[in-house]
Amino acid sequence: MSDAYFKGITAALHTAGVCTPTLIIDRARLDRNIDHVIDVLNKGFEYRLVTKSLPSIPLLQYVMRRTGTQRLMCFHLPFLLQLVNHIPSSDILMGKPMPVRAAQEFYDWHSGQTSSMCFAPELQLQWLIDSMERLEQYEKLASQRNLRLRICLEIDVGLHRGGFRNTADFTAALRFIRRSNYLTLSGLMGYEAHITKMPIILGGIKSAFADTQGRYANFLRAAKAELGDHILDNLCINTGGSTTYTLYHNSKLVNEIAAGAALVMPSNFSAETLEHHHKAAFIAAPILKNISKPEIPLTPAISTMLRILGVLPKRACFIYGGNWLADPCYPEDTQHCKIFGRSSNQEMYGIPVDSDIKQDDFIFMT
């Protein structure tokens, strides 16, 4: 990304009167990333939009319109309440198993919301369940309140972050759901974020992907053996993630792919599977203080030596805010100054000596 690109954003921020740290979405880049997702969806998949990666109702609605989906994945009870209020037509899958108390709070809240009554949880909300213990807790809640709950079972396809790990326990859960008057099996979810992190010495991406597909297939065979071949026809068979969705070329095994961060490409989602994606989200932080020859307290002579050794930058700035989970990308070669530590108030960054950036301009992070 060029100087001209970020100078253009800086000018736009000044024109708009922005003077505080701001998250910027480049819609043109976002649209190109959405197009890449649509290319994969056109191979036969439904799309579930991961809301924690795009925590903005207007932004979610924009992506939903572009991709033609009503399917959302939610990870946080307060977010769930917002989604039900503002996007009541959505189909929501919880992206992690929630304490049963969270489910209870949701139904307490929902029962008192006249504006959200067009959202029917028994038809539009799936609770993710990772164990028999949690399944029994949810069944007890449902029986006490006479609720119908849609249950999506989390299966371990190699990540080993929980979920049903073997087909025996999985089959026991299927039988429990089948016998319940309050629970309905709505789907399976097998998350496989480890695939793109697998080192070559262990087989790399290709080997890890094949392994996860084999594990998922075993669970599907177990479901058909227990409930009949027809059972998969109407289930949500979910997988994928931002760094792995591009690996799926047909819908023979799964029918739904989830992704969110791939649309905006933060630094920690960089992967070879996303080399065709563009960074589309940036934090712009105003420069409060532009410092030449920065020093540490009480030690001017040592500070000079530290600058010579490169431990302390030759030029620095203190920004408005800081301590974000993001890496500086403009000015080029800007780096966090470790010797001063982290700060959420005024964080110090070393900037190039020859940069023409000045006070009240912005540094950018992604």
Regions found by a protein language model. Name each.
Residues 207, 243-335:
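Active-site loop ensemble at the mouth of alpha/beta enzyme cores that anchors a bound cofactor
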